[in-house]
Amino acid sequence: MYEVDHADVYDLFYLGRGKDYAAEASDIADLVRSRTPEASSLLDVACGTGTHLEHFTKEFGDTAGLELSEDMLTHARKRLPDATLHQGDMRDFRLGRKFSAVVSMFSSVGYLKTTEELGAAVASFAEHLEPGGVVVVEPWWFPETFADGWVSADVVRRDGRTVARVSHSVREGNATRMEVHFTVADPGKGVRHFSDVHLITLFHQAEYEAAFTAAGLRVEYLEGGPSGRGLFVGVPA
């Protein structure tokens, strides 16, 4: 999903654009403790470069991250040299321990292709949950909330670098096809450009809820969330 160039500019761009990882982690911690007051451990699934995990660790102490991309994990290890980080697939990972909370942020579950894969992922989340624990998932847009043809454009200047990002998103079958272009300029490397295409599944709300239910979780959908796409919260039924 993410290659070296993406991982290199990922944090710089989103931090420069104003994404507040600390506030988001604090809000998720409050949500977790509203369901599980004694929560003391957390697993961050699809942790990326560790920007949320860094702040989750301040909230819980006992944390771990799971990430599929080795490039992202390389950056996460630099950011969090003492963190417990695993390379693995959210659909079938087995870590041999359980957590008070299992969370997946930034709509990472949208990269799953089918309801079967979504169900397998949520079942893996539930498999790693302590009795009385909580699962929190930030979804991608639903079919009825996705804005077909959406164009996003931002320029970020940070740490001597300038990053311009433009994207165009259209509906393709049951997915969002997002074409993303980055132009990066810095004094040492000059100007470079890269692009890629993301296919992000437009699962229905009911399909998320069915995955939670099949995993033995009682599920609630909360509107809003960090990016306006809401949050699914599940506790053992």
Swiss-Prot record:
EC number(s) recorded for this UniProt protein: 2.1.1.234
InterPro entries: Methyltransf_25, SAM-dependent_MTases_sf
CDD domains to which the protein is assigned, alphabetical: AdoMet_MTases
Residues binding substrate: 14, 17, 145-147, 152, 165-169, 229
Catalysed reaction, written as an equation: dTDP-3-amino-3,4,6-trideoxy-alpha-D-glucose + 2 S-adenosyl-L-methionine = dTDP-alpha-D-desosamine + 2 S-adenosyl-L-homocysteine + 2 H(+)
Pathway as given in its UniProt record: Antibiotic biosynthesis
GO MF, one example: protein homodimerization activity
Residues the record lists as binding S-adenosyl-L-methionine: 21, 46, 67, 89-90, 105
GO biological process terms on file: antibiotic biosynthetic process; methylation
Keyword annotations from UniProtKB, A to Z: Antibiotic biosynthesis, Methyltransferase, S-adenosyl-L-methionine, Transferase
Subunit structure: Homodimer.
Family statement: Belongs to the methyltransferase TylM1/DesVI family.
Biological role stated in the UniProt entry: S-adenosyl-L-methionine-dependent methyltransferase involved in the biosynthesis of desosamine, found in certain macrolide antibiotics such as erthyromycin, azithromycin, clarithromycin, and methymycin. Catalyzes the last step in the biosynthesis of dTDP-desosamine, i.e. the N,N-dimethylation of the 3-amino group of dTDP-3-amino-3,4,6-trideoxy-alpha-D-glucose.
Name assigned to this protein: dTDP-3-amino-3,4,6-trideoxy-alpha-D-glucopyranose N,N-dimethyltransferase
